[in-house]
């Protein structure tokens, strides 16, 4: 298990684990970190370093459970992270899916209409998860997150099984790869909720 520690240069960590870039962004940390350590960047950005390490290590390691000493973040920090995660999905991920769909060159086919309806349902599920988390109704939010993951699987399945004939193959493949990445991110988000965020709220 490869863990991130506060004395590690954050730039080197990002270079080894580029998948954490969106997670860092949700915490208010962008690129351009220079040679600063994880702790130095957190101090500069006003981020709780232990909270960040809990999030990142849980994101990267399926078998990781945060140390009790890490579970000190405020309720405001947790709710802010949850909100920024959903906003990232709604303002970054979903629009990318919609943009890919618009370039599939499917015309006004039945599969395209089905895809649009599924993506609309995906957007609604994520919006509902965000709303319920803001009310601290975490069980309801978990259900909406699971629904979102199932919808991503449904979109992938529809593309694989129903799209045929003349279409933009490169864009279709890119969409499948992107959906797989989105599925992985959402699954990691659920793991972080169970192991880090919700325990901090109790």
Label the model's feature ranges.
Residues 1-202:
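Small-residue-biased structural context
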């Amino acid at each position: 298990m490869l863990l991130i520690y506060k004395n590690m240069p954050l730039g080197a960590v990002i270079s080894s684990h580029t998948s954490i870039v969106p997670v860092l962004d949700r915490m208010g940390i962008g690129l351009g970190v220079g040679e600063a350590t994880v702790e130095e960047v957190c101090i500069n950005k006003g981020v709780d370093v232990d909270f960040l390490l809990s999030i990142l290590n849980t994101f990267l390691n399926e078998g990781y459970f945060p140390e009790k000493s890490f579970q000190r973040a405020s309720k405001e920090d947790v709710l802010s992270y949850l909100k920024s995660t959903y906003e990232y999905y709604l303002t970054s991920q979903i629009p990318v899916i919609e943009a890919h769909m618009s370039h599939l060159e499917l015309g006004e086919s039945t599969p395209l209409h089905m895809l649009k309806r599924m993506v609309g349902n995906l957007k609604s599920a994520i919006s509902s998860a965000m709303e319920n988390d803001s009310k601290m109704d975490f069980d309801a939010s978990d259900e909406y997150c699971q629904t979102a993951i199932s919808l991503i699987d449904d979109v992938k399945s529809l593309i694989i099984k129903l799209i045929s004939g003349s279409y933009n193959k490169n864009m279709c493949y890119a969409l499948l790869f992107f959906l797989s990445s989105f599925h992985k991110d959402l699954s990691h988000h659920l793991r972080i909720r169970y192991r880090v965020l919700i325990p901090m709220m109790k």
